[in-house]
């Protein structure tokens, strides 16, 4: 089961701590992942603190605790805990949020589940910092689509797909969709707006991606033009040559392109933004890229296996 706020930024909260100082989550936790503990006794919280205080911020809700490396969050009415953990709890729990304060995991405080936190924290480790002198203006976010939804999308694609086409203007200036294997080669499925799968994808993007677009770029009030599942198969030599996603009158209202990886058991592939660098962008499975539809980009060939991807265009309202 996907925990509440998985892939979403936790809501902000403000408290006055035991020393009379104001603590604001979004303002004061400024680096690294966070473990949020609800319902634990001091000894239980202390064990978690010893294991993780060097790798994560640790917040404990409820009574004041004397544990090194733990910030106690006063919550006498249980309102903050209810907002973050979504309702009643029968046993103490711990939730892990990444450095962007988006939820990654939630497990019981006691028992084998805590071992999962070590693996989850290890997965959040970043590569060594680098000085960058050229980079495309692209947002890369993990955890946009959960594993169950990704599997459903791939299954739907395998049941119904067709050769991808390119939007053009013909000699008379009339819009047309044509196959151009020298420019684009892949298989596509357009999701049916009437099906629950479409609604589930729309909800995931609204809850997990749109707040980040607003935070980073002040992008708001866009609608999904359509959702597509596409495959790039190594055996077919699939690719999509460099192009822009809003270069025709019919696509001029597109603003943001979204590309979400549905699997990671392939080699090669990814996107290149040649106006800025030769770097190849590839999100983890379930994660994706968001970028302006005006950016020139190309989908490079997969060298082994098959890459499945969810594609979307966010456009201005009709």
Which residue ranges define each predicted feature?
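Chalcogenol-based redox active-site neighborhoods
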Residues: 1-125
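Structural recognition of the beta-strand scaffold that forms the well-ordered cores
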Residues: 60, 289-290
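Fe(II)/2-oxoglutarate oxygenase catalytic core
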Residues: 88, 99, 110-288, 294-318
């Amino acid at each position: 089961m996907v925990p509440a706020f998985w892939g979403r930024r936790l809501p902000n909260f403000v408290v006055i701590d035991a020393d009379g100082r104001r603590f604001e989550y979004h303002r004061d936790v400024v680096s690294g992942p966070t473990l949020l503990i609800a319902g634990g006794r001091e000894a239980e919280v202390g064990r978690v603190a010893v294991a993780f205080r060097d790798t994560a911020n640790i917040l404990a809700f409820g009574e004041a605790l004397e544990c090194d490396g733990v910030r106690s969050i006063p919550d006498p009415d249980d309102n903050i805990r209810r907002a973050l953990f979504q309702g009643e709890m029968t046993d103490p729990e711990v939730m892990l949020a990444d450095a962007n304060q988006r939820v990654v995991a939630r497990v019981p405080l006691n028992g084998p589940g805590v071992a999962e936190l070590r693996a989850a924290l290890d997965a959040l480790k970043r590569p060594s910092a680098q000085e960058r002198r050229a980079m495309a203006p692209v947002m890369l976010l993990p955890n946009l689509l959960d594993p169950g939804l990704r599997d459903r999308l791939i299954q739907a694609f395998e049941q119904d797909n067709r050769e991808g086409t390119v939007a053009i203007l013909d000699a008379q200036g009339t819009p047309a969709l044509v196959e151009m294997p020298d420019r684009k080669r892949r298989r596509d499925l357009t999701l049916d707006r009437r099906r629950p799968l479409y609604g589930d994808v729309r909800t995931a993007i609204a809850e997990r991606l749109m707040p980040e677009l607003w935070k980073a770029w002040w992008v708001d009030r866009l609608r999904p033009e359509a959702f597509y599942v596409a495959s790039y198969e190594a055996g077919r030599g699939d690719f999509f040559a460099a192009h822009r996603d809003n270069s025709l009158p019919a696509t001029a209202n597109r603003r943001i392109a979204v590309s979400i990886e549905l699997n990671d058991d392939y080699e090669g592939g990814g996107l290149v933004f040649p106006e800025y660098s030769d770097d190849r962008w590839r999100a983890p499975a379930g994660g994706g890229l968001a970028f302006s539809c005006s950016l020139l980009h190309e989908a490079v060939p997969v060298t082994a296996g098959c890459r499945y991807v969810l594609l979307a265009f966010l456009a201005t309202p009709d």
